[in-house]
Amino acid sequence: MVRFGRNDNKEGIILNIGVYGGTFNPIHFGHLRTAEEVFHKFKLKQVIFVPSAQPPHKSDEEVIDPLHRLKMLTLAITGNEHFTVSDLEIIRPGKSYTVETIRELKKQNPDANFYFILGLDAFLEINTWYHWQELFLETNFIVTTRPGSPQVRPNRIIPQEIRPQFKWKAKNKEFVYSS
């Protein structure tokens, strides 16, 4: 796991919240284990699972109905007090765009510091996302890999267009984005 953070010096932050977005088509043990590991490793207060209603990079016929995925997620996290599910993208009309979701969560929780959790496969395509460069101004990233995946040097996965704006912070073992 690699953390990509913003150069944030907010005073009084009391909540570090993970936002685990995705299709969850369907939710499985790998998602839950990843969320649990990230929760502990990064000392988060909670992890919010946000299933996308209309994923921009997937066709409708390959995705289970959003309400069914929401129900499956809700059942899967039952009993885990630090996991919650948000229906933000399910109730919002149109395509599900991460930047809009993060902005809405920040409005709802102005004292929180958000960490968007995603897999390396998704992060490698982030420069195809809607307003992807703005995401680096809005949230921190935690990029996860699947067990057995080859080691990737973190500086090689940062999109080339914004690579110069990242600096390695050895103390925290993370890349920090400075706008």
Residue ranges and their predicted role:
Residues 3-4, 9-179:
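Nucleotidyltransferase catalytic core that binds NTPs
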